[in-house]
Every structure is written in C-alpha cells, then in structure tokens.
C-alpha cells in the first residue's frame, strides 16, 4: 500500500524503493523483537567476514554466478550463527544488490544503528577493549559527535597499541603504528 502511494520516476527507482521498504520492515521487526542492536552487530561482523574472505565476497558479487547457488552458499555460512532477521537481510542483499555485498551489508548495519538513533564508530584496536574502555570511549565520542554511538570493534595486533576510530569519513588514528608512520614521514 505504501509503495502504491509513492511517485516513482522509473521502474528501477520503484524497485530500489521496494527493496528499501522491505529492508526497513525487517529491521523494524528486529526492533519489535528487541533484537535490533544484535542484528546491527551481526551485520557488521558479516561485513568484516566478507572483507577477510575475498573469495567469498567475489563469488557473492559475481553477476554471472547462479543467484540461487549464491544464496544457498551464504545461507550455509550463516545458518545457526545469526538471527533470522540478519539472515533474511543478508540473503536479500545477495539477491538484490545495490553496490556490492560488503558495502550493502555495512550500509544495513549503519541503517540499523540509525534506527536506534545512533551513529557508528568502527574502532580497530591492538587488543580487545574491556567493557570499561568501551563505555569510556563511547561516552567521549558521544561528547564529540553529539549523538549516541554504536561502537563496532575489531582487533588488529599490527597496530601495536592504541586504536583507529572511524566515524563516517572521519578517521582518528591514535595507534602506535600510525604514530610511528607519522614520525618516519617527518624524518624524511
């Protein structure tokens, strides 16, 4: 009914609008089930899995590959590891891609955060953050950005120490490896 009331310029615009409405409905269902934060985190983790598994990502993005086979493969990867909403959203991304699997899944994670009134900060640290560090960082970022923050964390030992924080296109590099690189650049 909602889609019928909309004004669509092209069939492609209508398709995109319907896909967006379907994704929003699934996220609202997760919200009503009290699972929206979990779905957001699962989608983020899936985007990171796809980044770390380029063969899987390339296969899922391959327009010439059988769509049913791609969905079956992803369903096997996700089965029993994520909520039903996360699985449905991920399978829909593969069936109706807008850009590529990684970007589409990541965009859904950010959209889930936005539905909760949050901005996303991706925090890559040399070691896993403690709960206290997580809370302190979230509070500081909320002060900077004037929004509640969803912290999506990942560990990268190559940073040696510290962390890199990404909020949208802004990057705050407080990592030891980043500081060393900046010092090297100054010496040259």
Task: Pin down the residues of each PLM region.
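Elongated, mostly alpha-helical coiled-coil "stalk/stator" tethers of large membrane protein machines
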Residues: 1-164, 170, 175-188
């Amino acid at each position: 009914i909602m889609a019928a009331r909309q004004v669509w310029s092209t069939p492609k615009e209508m398709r995109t609008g319907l896909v967006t409405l379907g994704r929003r409905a699934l996220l609202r269902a997760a919200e009503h089930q009290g699972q929206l934060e979990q779905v957001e985190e699962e989608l983020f983790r899936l985007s990171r899995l796809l980044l770390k598994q380029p063969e899987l990502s390339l296969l899922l993005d391959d327009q010439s590959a059988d769509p049913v086979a791609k969905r079956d493969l992803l369903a096997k990867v996700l089965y029993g590891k994520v909520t039903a909403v996360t699985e449905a959203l991920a399978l829909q991304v593969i069936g109706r891609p807008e850009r590529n699997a990684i970007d589409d899944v990541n965009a859904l994670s950010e959209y889930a955060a936005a539905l909760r009134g949050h901005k996303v900060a991706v925090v890559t640290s040399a070691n896993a953050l403690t709960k206290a560090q997580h809370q302190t960082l979230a509070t500081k970022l909320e002060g900077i950005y004037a929004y509640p923050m969803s912290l999506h964390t990942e560990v990268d030992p190559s940073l040696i120490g510290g962390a890199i924080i990404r909020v949208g296109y802004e990057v705050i590099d407080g990592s030891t490896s980043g500081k060393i690189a900046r010092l090297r650049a100054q010496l040259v």
